[in-house]
C-alpha cells in the first residue's frame, strides 16, 4: 500500500506480538507510535493510507503504561530534601536510575524540613518531560511540615509547623513558592487546615491527608474541602477501630462528594503493610489504590547509615529505620518490586497490579488523558514486561530509554 504522509512525515513504529494493557484488560493487539504519541491505526490506514516504518517484535511480552511514582524521597545516595550544591544533578541521577524499574514519571518528595530548605530546593525541582536522560518530573510532593507530632513517623519534630490562618501566607512563608508543586500531605485535624486545603486545591495542587491523628469525620471534611489522596494508608495514622475507623474509613465512606474518587497510597514492600492489610484495602476500594515506593536515599545502596532530610537512617536488609530506633523511615523498594509483591500478596489480576502503578496515579494527578494509559493520543510512555512482571524495556515518548 502506498504511503500518504500528508499528516506527518515522522516515522511510525509498530509493536507486534504483544499483549497491551487497554480498557483494564491485556489484549492481543499491536501498538502504534508516532511523534511520541499512541497512534490510532484505523485513522492511519483509512485517512492517510499509511503503514509502519519500523516494526518491533515484542515476542509475546506485555506492554503496559509506564509506572508513575508519586512518593519518591530519593535513592542511590541522593536525598531530595537536602539542599546540596547540585540539586538538579541529584534528581537527574535518580530519574535515570529508575528507568530500569519501569518508572517513566515521578514526583520528587520532600519530607518535613525548615523553610530555608524548601526555599532553596523547590525552585530547583522543575516539572520536565522524561526522555533518554531519565523519567519525567510531574511536580513536587511536599510531605509535611503541617503534620501531626504524634504521627510524625521519621519526620523531625523540631521542624513541624501549624497553620496560623491556613491561607496563602502560611504556605508561602513555609514553602517560598508553590510553582512546580503537585501534591501536599497534611494532617486535616490541624487548626485552619480547611483553609489550606481550599487554597491548595484552588491552585490545582493535589491535597493528601496523612501523618495524622484525624478521626473519620475530620478526614471526610478534608475530602469535602478538596483532599483526594491518603498518604501511605495504615502508616502514620490512627489504626482502624470499629467505632471510629479514622482515615482508613474513607475507603468506604458514604460522605464522599458525588463524582469524586479518594485515592490512597500503599507501600507494597512487604514491610510497611501486612499482606492481609493490602488485601483488605484493595478489596474495599480497588479503584483507588495507588502503589508508591516511598523510597529513600538508600534505595540502591548497601546496608549502613545514610541521610534522609535532616535525619540519619540505618539500612538493615530491606528495612530503613531512623538511626538508633525501630521506627520505619521510608522504604528501599523499587516500583517493579512493589508491583510484583502487590500482585502476589493481594491475589489481584496482572491488570490490576499494573494499573495501580500507572493508571491510578495518573487519575489522582488529573493527567490520565496523557499518562498512565495506552489510549490513542496519549504519551507513548510504556514498558515491556515478561510474564513474571519483570521490566525488560522502558520507553518514553516512543523512544527506548532502557533495555535489560
Curated annotation (Swiss-Prot):
EC nos: 3.5.1.25
The pathway to which it is assigned is: Amino-sugar metabolism; N-acetylneuraminate degradation
Uppermost EC category? hydrolase
Q: Per UniProt, which keywords does this protein have?
A: Carbohydrate metabolism, Hydrolase, Metal-binding
**According to its UniProt record, which cofactors does this protein need?**
a divalent metal cation
- Pfam families (alphabetical): Amidohydro_1
**CDD domains (alphabetical):** NagA (cd00854)
Its domain of life reads: Eukaryota
State where substrate binds.
Answer: 154-155, 235-236, 243, 269-272, 328-330
Kindly give the InterPro entries that the UniProt entry links to this protein.
Answer: Amidohydro-rel, GlcNAc_6-P_deAcase, Metal-dep_hydrolase_composite, Metal_Hydrolase
* Keyword Endoplasmic reticulum attached: no
Question: Looking at the keywords, is Metal-binding present?
Answer: yes
Q: How is the cofactor bound?
A: Binds 1 divalent metal cation per subunit.
Which positions bind a divalent metal cation?
A: 143, 211, 232
Reported function: Hydrolyzes the N-glycolyl group from N-glycolylglucosamine 6-phosphate (GlcNGc-6-P) in the N-glycolylneuraminic acid (Neu5Gc) degradation pathway.
**What name appears for this protein in its UniProt entry?**
N-acetylglucosamine-6-phosphate deacetylase
- Give the organism, scientific name: Danio rerio (Zebrafish)
Q: According to the entry, what is the taxonomic lineage of the organism? A: Eukaryota, Metazoa, Chordata, Craniata, Vertebrata
Amino acid at each position: 500500500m502506498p504511503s500518504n504522509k500528508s499528516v506527518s512525515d515522522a516515522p511510525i513504529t509498530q509493536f507486534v506480538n504483544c499483549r497491551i494493557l487497554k480498557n483494564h484488560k491485556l489484549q492481543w493487539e499491536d501498538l502504534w507510535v508516532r511523534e511520541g504519541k499512541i497512534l490510532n491505526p484505523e485513522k492511519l490506514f483509512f485517512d492517510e493510507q499509511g503503514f509502519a516504518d519500523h516494526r518491533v517484535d515484542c515476542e509475546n511480552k506485555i506492554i503496559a503504561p509506564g509506572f508513575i511514582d508519586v512518593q519518591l524521597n530519593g535513592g542511590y545516595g541522593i536525598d531530595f530534601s537536602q539542599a546540596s550544591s547540585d540539586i538538579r544533578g541529584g534528581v537527574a541521577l535518580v530519574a535515570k536510575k529508575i528507568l530500569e524499574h519501569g518508572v517513566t514519571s515521578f514526583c520528587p518528595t520532600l519530607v518535613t524540613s525548615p523553610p530555608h530548605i524548601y526555599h532553596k530546593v523547590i525552585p530547583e525541582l522543575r516539572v520536565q518531560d522524561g526522555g533518554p536522560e531519565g523519567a519525567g518530573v510531574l511536580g513536587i510532593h511536599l510531605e509535611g511540615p503541617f503534620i501531626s507530632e504524634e504521627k510524625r513517623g521519621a519526620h523531625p519534630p523540631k521542624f513541624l509547623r501549624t497553620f496560623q490562618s491556613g491561607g496563602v501566607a502560611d504556605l508561602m512563608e513555609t514553602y517560598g513558592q508553590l510553582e512546580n508543586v503537585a501534591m501536599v500531605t497534611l494532617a486535616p485535624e490541624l487548626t485552619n487546615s480547611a483553609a489550606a486545603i481550599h487554597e491548595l486545591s484552588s491552585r490545582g495542587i493535589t491535597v493528601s491527608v496523612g501523618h495524622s491523628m484525624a478521626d473519620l469525620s475530620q478526614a471526610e471534611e478534608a475530602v469535602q474541602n478538596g483532599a483526594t489522596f491518603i498518604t501511605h494508608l495504615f502508616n502514620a495514622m490512627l489504626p482502624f477501630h470499629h467505632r471510629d475507623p479514622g482515615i482508613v474509613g474513607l475507603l468506604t465512606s458514604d460522605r464522599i462528594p458525588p463524582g469524586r474518587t479518594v485515592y490512597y497510597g500503599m507501600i507494597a514492600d512487604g514491610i510497611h503493610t501486612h499482606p492481609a492489610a493490602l488485601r483488605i484495602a484493595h478489596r474495599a476500594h480497588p479503584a483507588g489504590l495507588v502503589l508508591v515506593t516511598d523510597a529513600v536515599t538508600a534505595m540502591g545502596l548497601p546496608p549502613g547509615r545514610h541521610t534522609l532530610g535532616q535525619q540519619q537512617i540505618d539500612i538493615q536488609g530491606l528495612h530503613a529505620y531512623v538511626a538508633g530506633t525501630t521506627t520505619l523511615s521510608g522504604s528501599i523498594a523499587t516500583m517493579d518490586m512493589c508491583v510484583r509483591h502487590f500482585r502476589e500478596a493481594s491475589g489481584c489480576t496482572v491488570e490490576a497490579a499494573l494499573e495501580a502503578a500507572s493508571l491510578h496515579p495518573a487519575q489522582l494527578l488529573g493527567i490520565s488523558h496523557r499518562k498512565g494509559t495506552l489510549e490513542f493520543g496519549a504519551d507513548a510512555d510504556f514498558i515491556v514486561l515478561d510474564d513474571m512482571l519483570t521490566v525488560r524495556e522502558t520507553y518514553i515518548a516512543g523512544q527506548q530509554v532502557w533495555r535489560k
